[in-house]
Design a protein with these regions (language model features):
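Extended, low-complexity, turn-rich repeat/linker tracts enriched in Gly/Pro/Ser/Thr and Asp/Glu
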Residues: 81-86, 140-144, 186
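Short tryptophan-centered beta-strand motifs in secreted/extracellular beta-sheet-rich domains
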Residues: 75-77, 129-142, 146-152
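Short, aromatic/His-centered strand-loop micro-motif at the edge of beta-sheets
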Residues: 112-137
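Extracellular glycan-recognition surfaces and repeat-rich motifs
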Residues: 7-11, 16-48
Length: 205
């Protein structure tokens, strides 16, 4: 391919100095250019998945890491948002088509599906630059009704015995790929680490 037109000028990344990174697994749908594997903050040199902020077109990142027919599993992971008390990002997971999100600026833990049609939240106080553990599962009854359960707690502390939020759904989703989510509208990086997907019958609590 050749052209007489001059090449487009390179656009520098003005958000950060040159940073070493690796791409996420290729099989993770739509992960590249939205997420990168980088050295994690405060993790002693370990690597974590970073939601990038230099491209404003990709402020919202939603990726799937498993098969669409997956069901009856518990998904959990470590999460962190950079920022301050007035500027935080959103980080969450997708379990069986339900989006479970820690919302920074509104200080909530939210469960939603199809956004406006199904959405419930509870207050949850959390701070930037601190790792938390986020966990969720979906239980579906024989009559098709279901319950979405999620909890979050500060990493390093004991897991709470009760769920932070539990939402009933009359017609529950019976399957759906596990996934990851982040929204960075105020250019604060979000981080995800130590992802675990296990069958519900082997998950603790």
């Amino acid at each position: 391919l050749s052209t007489d037109a001059p090449p487009a000028p390179a656009v520098p990344n003005t958000f950060e100095p040159p940073t070493a990174f690796a791409y996420p697994p290729l099989a993770w749908n739509a992960a590249r250019f939205r997420f990168e594997v980088r050295q994690a903050p405060g993790e002693g040199g370990t690597k974590a998945l970073c939601k990038t902020i230099e491209n404003k077109l990709f402020q919202r990142g939603q990726i799937f890491i498993g098969r669409p027919g997956s069901k009856n599993y518990t998904l959990e992971m470590d999460v962190l948002t950079e920022g301050n008390k007035r500027k935080m990002s959103e980080i969450g997971l997708i379990n069986q088509r339900y989006l479970v999100v820690l919302k920074g600026n509104s200080q909530q833990l939210e469960v939603s599906s199809n956004q406006e049609r199904f959405r419930e939240s509870v207050p949850f106080a959390w701070v930037p630059n601190q790792w938390y553990r986020l966990k969720a599962r979906v239980d579906v009854a024989a009559d098709g009704s279901g319950s979405v359960k999620a909890k979050a707690w500060k990493k390093g502390e004991e897991e709470p015995a009760v769920w932070t939020i539990e939402v009933a759904h009359k017609h529950a989703h019976t399957e759906g790929a596990p996934g990851l989510f982040s929204f960075t509208p105020q250019e604060q990086r979000a981080w995800i680490d130590n992802i675990s997907v296990v069958p519900n019958n082997t998950a603790t609590r």
